[in-house]
């Protein structure tokens, strides 16, 4: 056969295999693949999410996915056309029909009819065959491949195969038969893979190799695995696959084999007594491991089968059948009558019609303040001595039917007619009794009897309107002997401190509060620390027995002298009252100024002045400013100056060099009112310089020599003794010759002076940052002529900061940047450290030539500098002869 013949044969084969290549494609017409669809379901109860089948809608190429709408809201059509159950459905008739709508690109509504048929063994487009057991079983056929570009009327959707759990058998039990259309052409062998087929435990699902019957070999448990996914395979006798693997989903349908279980055996809650109907108390919860999505086997319904006690009504509580919330059904909860209710709660599946279990709910009725406290008895009598506070008068008792030790039981007592707040009632937390006490002392002379009205309530307010219980308390005041009362309790009297002795200062008396008792009062002084006062015991007149002194710091504080006076009556027993007498002593200028200190040491050489403070115990204006003067010839050797403007201190210093030893200085001080006083200061002159640190008193060595000399020369001549004395006086006078303050001018020439010893200083903070006009980031460009320029990254320099405290960091960081600069030394180049403007031109090194002329070494100008530079001029000046 020639090449043209082979080409023609191949073309015919291609046309025979692919007819769409040999004719023009049909035009696209939007619409459903069929006018109606029929899907068969295995039973009347359809669980939620069950796949029923698939409808197809051709919207032509390029159009978006179609949106389907079912006129029966119990079913849902997904965008891929798969029809599922939206919520559990029960088919009352063997057949159910509804419409599914879709819209084309022109918004034209298109519809198709969907019919559901109830059949035990079905498939909507497969024939039925008898199973080996003689029952009619579903047959699944491998889907064939699609050919051409024409619109397909229907797509293959394999609905899940349902298998009830807990089946009794006999096993193996046939589920479905797998068929291949290639059985007419060749012998086909079938196999399955997937869960429990070829994975452990192997063999739960098997398939007959030649007939394609899919079987289950044992009962299934939905609570363990609810869905199995298997793949069926078809191969020819030579082992070649003739069909694509087909997915088979086996859904284990639930059986009501588990009863609900409560989360607790006993539920506990509380409710307030008097709660209104509808008040929620608690919620009980039960669970069921059966299928709660597709069946009612886990739909739990709650009930209350029993109540204990069944009073005052047999149904005091109700429970929501679906949620398990227990609430109050009727009024009548009373803690005092029935404090606790025990309920039997039942939970049953199938919405309360199936398997059931029970639990216990215990409801405690909480107390509310629905019972008012009552006095028992309602009349009380008590007595209390006068003037005593916090004294118990009587005990009040109440009864309360509410729960003890709760706010609804705890009593609160109130005295209704006690406007002056003279009484209080304290509640005992254990017995709830109230103790009536006096809040402050009562006065028998003012009132002998009180009639009180006491009301009682609770800490918690009443839940309902209740009458308030009251009691009547009669309180008798007992008269006692009261102490006399000084009027006023504290008396202040102002007298001068030079008040005469024996004169009456004041009269300080007390009154007798017991008006019904005619008693006599006597007075005496209880405390008089300075023994300055005396009192008339009958009249209470106080007079002086000694001179008063305001400056007595041991007894007088802030010019006030305090004395305590007591008054005693003749009652039985006697009572004593106390009064305080405050004597304010007016100042009198009876004290002269006194210097402090009065003893001091001076150095003989370069003595330091001493500060003398002036003290005056009197008060202004009897004090500063003071006047000071030296008396009795003290001004010859000493001077005084005022140290401050107020003239309250002096500066004492010697006029000349004094002899070693003790000196007496008479200092006269005068206050502002011309009160003067002369004080002698003891001054010792020490053998030291400047400030006295360790004063060594001079030993009279020379004077000591006179006595031994006189004793040694018993037979000497008086003239020889006088001569020796004259010689000693001459030697002493030479020793005390004053040295000049400054050495002669010639002696200072060879002294060495250190002028650079300035001691420690502080860091200079007074500088202007603006003077740093150019930082490293703005330094002038440096051109190098000795090295070839290279392309290198220029280091980044930190700009000059505005904060002066950052100058140190600024210098350190830029120094590090300069050290890492690759263009920096050791290369020879011009380095610019800081540009400060143009400067004066400096001479070059070549200009520093060695001079051979005498003019270059002219040092004659040194002669003008005086004698101290004469030697320097002689050394370097030279003459023409040199």
Swiss-Prot record:
InterPro entries: Cadherin, Cadherin-like_dom, Cadherin-like_sf, Cadherin_CS, Cadherin_pro_dom, Cadherin_Y-type_LIR, Catenin-bd_sf. The lineage of its organism: Eukaryota, Metazoa, Chordata, Craniata, Vertebrata. The modification Phosphoserine is found at residues 770, 793, 838, 840, 846. It comes from the Eukaryota. Residues 24-154 form a propeptide. Residues 811-882 are annotated as: Required for binding alpha, beta and gamma catenins. It is a single-pass type I membrane protein. One of its GO terms (cellular component) is catenin complex. The modification Phosphotyrosine is found at residues 753-755. The record marks 700-701, 731-732, 750-751 as: Cleavage. It is found in: Cell junction, Adherens junction; Cell membrane; Endosome; Golgi apparatus, trans-Golgi network. This is Cadherin-1. Residues 758-769 are annotated as: Required for binding CTNND1 and PSEN1. Glycans are attached at residues 280, 285, 358, 470, 472, 509, 558, 576, 578, 580, 637. Its main location: other. One of its GO terms (biological process) is adherens junction organization. Residues 731-882 are cytoplasmic. Three calcium ions are usually bound at the interface of each cadherin domain and strengthen the connections, imparting a strong curvature to the full-length ectodomain. The chain crosses the membrane at residues 710-730. Keywords: Calcium, Cell adhesion, Cell junction, Cell membrane, Cleavage on pair of basic residues, Cytoplasm, Disulfide bond, Endosome, Glycoprotein, Golgi apparatus, Membrane, Metal-binding, Phosphoprotein, Repeat, Signal, Transmembrane, Transmembrane helix, Ubl conjugation. Cadherins are calcium-dependent cell adhesion proteins. They preferentially interact with themselves in a homophilic manner in connecting cells; cadherins may thus contribute to the sorting of heterogeneous cell types. CDH1 is involved in mechanisms regulating cell-cell adhesions, mobility and proliferation of epithelial cells. Promotes organization of radial actin fiber structure and cellular response to contractile forces, via its interaction with AMOTL2 which facilitates anchoring of radial actin fibers to CDH1 junction complexes at the cell membrane. It holds the Pfam family Cadherin.
